[in-house]
């Protein structure tokens, strides 16, 4: 079974974990209703995507 020969230093451990952080989601604004929405997704408020109505929001709720 593999066992490390040397103890991993705090510096090396932190350098390895430098890319493990979480990133926040980018939020864009819907051009139709100006409400916040996630990019490349249908607007949950008005139901449009790229200027076309995809969902009938009044019928869905």
Curated annotation (Swiss-Prot):
Biased composition annotated in UniProt, kind: Basic residues: 1-16
Pfam families to which the protein is assigned, alphabetical: Ribosomal_L32p
Family matches, as InterPro entries: Ribosomal_bL32, Ribosomal_bL32_bact, Ribosomal_zn-bd
Family (UniProt): Belongs to the bacterial ribosomal protein bL32 family.
Keywords, sorted A to Z: Ribonucleoprotein, Ribosomal protein
Gene: rpmF
GO BP annotation list: translation
Signal sequence annotation: none
Protein name from the UniProt record: Large ribosomal subunit protein bL32
Cellular component, GO, one term: large ribosomal subunit
Organism the protein comes from: Pelobacter propionicus (strain DSM 2379 / NBRC 103807 / OttBd1)
Gene Ontology terms, MF aspect: structural constituent of ribosome
Ranges where the record places region Disordered: 1-20
Annotated NCBIfam families: rpmF_bact
Superkingdom of this protein's organism: Bacteria
Family matches, as Gene3D superfamilies: Single helix bin
Keyword Ion transport belongs to the record: no
């Amino acid at each position: 079974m593999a066992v490390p020969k040397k103890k991993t230093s705090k510096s090396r451990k932190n350098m390895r974990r430098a890319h493990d952080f979480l990133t926040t989601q980018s939020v864009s604004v819907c051009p139709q209703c100006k409400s916040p929405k996630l990019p490349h997704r249908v607007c949950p408020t008005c139901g449009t995507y790229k200027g076309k109505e995809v969902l009938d929001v009044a019928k869905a709720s």
